[in-house]
Amino acid sequence: MTKLVPPHGSDTLKSLALEGNALTVELERAKLLPKINCSSREEGDIIMMGVGGFTPLEGFMGKADWQSVCDNMTIESGLFWPIPITLSTDNEGVNQGDEVALVNGETDEIIATMVISEKYSIDKTHECNTVYKTTEIEHPGVVMVMAQGKYNLAGSIKVLSDGGFPEKYSSLYMTPMETRAYFDDKGWKTVAAFQTRNPMHRSHEYLVKIAVEVCDGVMIHSVLGNLKAGDIPANVRSEAISVLIENYFVDNTILQSGYPLDMRYAGPREALLHALFRQNYGCSHLIVGRDHAGIDDYYGPFDAHNIFDEIADDALMTKALKIDWTFWCHKCGGMSSMKTCPHSAEDRALLSGTKVRKMLSDSEDLPETFSRPEVAKVLQAYYAGIKDEDKVEIKLNGHSAK
C-alpha cells in the first residue's frame, strides 16, 4: 500500500487519456467534428489532464470556475485551484452542446475531443491583474492571456494524444502514475519536487541537497513545454542535470523527470500550481527558493514563500519547503544562505540562471562558484553551436542584476 500523499481533491488519479480500441475509435470519430485550434499552452494543459497531472479536473473551466479561481483561488465547489485552466477560440460557429475536436494550431494533429458545456467571454485584464499582478504587455503571461480568443469554451474532454513527449524525451518524460510507482518501489514516503526551467547551478544543487537531508528523495522536475526566447532547451538541460546527479549526488536519492506544461511565469500563483500538480505526481513537498516561477522584477524575491502562508492549511497536502536566498560565500568557503552566513555582501557571489545564461551567451567561462565543471562543459558546448545571429540578448534585470 502506498505511503505517498493522495492526489489533489481525489482518492485516485483522474487520467483523461483514452487507450487501445477506445482511442482508435474516438480518433476516427474526431476527424468528422468541427476543429478548435489550440495554443501551445492549451495543448500542454490538455496533455497534463490526459496523464492525470491536473486531477481532479475533467476538462476546461466554465465562467463561474474562472471567476472563482481568479478571485479566490478555488473553483466554484470550493476546491483549491490557483490559476484558471481555460480554452479559448474566435470561432463564432460553435456553441453550447456542440462536440468539437481540439487540434494543434500548427500541425492540425487531433489532441482531444470536447463537449462544449459553456461558451463565455472573460475580462482578460482582470485575469492578468489577479493571476499575474500586472497588465504590462512585456510580461509573457500577460501576452498569453491577451492573445487568447474572443470566447472561452468549457467542457469535459477525452485526450487522444501524448503530444509526442514520450517519443521526444524517452524515459525523462514520466506520468504521475509512473512517478508514484517509482517512489513506491524505492519505499519513499516523503518526496520533495524541485521545479526547474534552467540547468542546475551551484545554488540549485545546494537547495536539492538540503531537501535530500530531510526527505526520502527528491524529484528534479523539468519543464518540457515552451519557454521564453533565450532559455536553454530541455535536452541540453537534461544532459547537464544528469552529469550533476552522476557526479555530485548519492545513488538512489534523486529522480530526474519532466512534465509537459508551458511556463506561465505567474510567480507566486504558479508556485501554488506547481505544488498542486506535484501532489498528483506523489510529492509531499515543493522546494521554493528565490523568485520561484518569476521573471524580471515583477515579483518580490520571496513572494512565492509568502503566498503559501495565505492559503488555508488544508488547501494543499504538498507543502512548501521554503529556503532562503542562497549564494557562494568566499569567507565560508562554500554555499550558504542568509540564515547560515554571517558575512557581508562583498563576500558573496549571488547566483541565478539568468546570470549563468548571460555569461554563456557572452562566451565567458563559468567559475566553479557558479557551476560544476562537468555542467559547464555541457552548456559551453551548446552555446558554442549557436550562431551569433541566432543568439538572444540576455539582460540582467531585477534580482538577477544583483
From Swiss-Prot:
Task: Please indicate which superkingdom the organism of origin belongs to.
Answer: Bacteria
Q: Which reaction does it catalyse?
A: sulfate + ATP + H(+) = adenosine 5'-phosphosulfate + diphosphate
Q: Which UniProt keywords apply?
A: ATP-binding, Nucleotide-binding, Nucleotidyltransferase, Transferase
User: Under which name does UniProt file this protein?
Assistant: Sulfate adenylyltransferase
* NCBIfam families for this protein: PRK04149.1, sopT
The entry lists its GO molecular-function terms as: ATP binding; sulfate adenylyltransferase (ATP) activity
List this protein's GO terms for biological process. Answer: hydrogen sulfide biosynthetic process; sulfate assimilation
Family, as annotated:
Belongs to the sulfate adenylyltransferase family.
